[in-house]
Amino acid sequence: MDIKHEVARSLLSIEAVFLRPQEPFTWASGIKSPIYCDNRLILTAPEARDLVERAIAETVKREYPQAQVLMGTATAGIAHAAIAAHLLGLPMGYVRSSSKDHGRQNRIEGKLVPGQKVVVVEDLISTGGSVLDAVDALREAGAEVLGVVSIFTYGMKRGVERLAAAQVRNVSLTDLDTVARMGAQEGYITEADVARLLAFRENPSDESWIQAESQA
């Protein structure tokens, strides 16, 4: 089994990724979703944590061999960046969602030298907004952002297009398609549910996948 499927199975087993097409979740945006992702749970599950953090480190070594610093996104990416940086023997810092309103008013925490080659560690990619905000802050500070390593991506068209437009490369450990198929294989959902999850990924604002469920 490759790492993409190993991570998918691990996330499902600890319910960091939860599939519930029969009872959709409601996101803050109001979108009805058959999937919910909380990668913070990885930190509470030692076996899953070991798998994921080693996979992040291996991905950095393989995809971004010139990396000099890892930068986590606040707050969810911080712990993952810290553990992976420890495994790699690299410096680590993180990017706040906004500058502090006291002290040195830092947006970027940790030492960053202009020109350093940085890899951003993110837990989840949906529309790409938060990670692109972090990349922008790092670029403004003079960093050369090599790309992103994320634990999970929904693979939404908007997110893919926004990353491409900003010339930001993202490598995810696993994705919605893999999780959906692994979910069916492991008995979490049915084969019919896989199609509903993929329909959701294609157009999250179109709730016809829910109607398809009720008609099935």
PLM regions with names:
Residues 1-121, 129-216:
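PRPP-associated nucleotide enzymes
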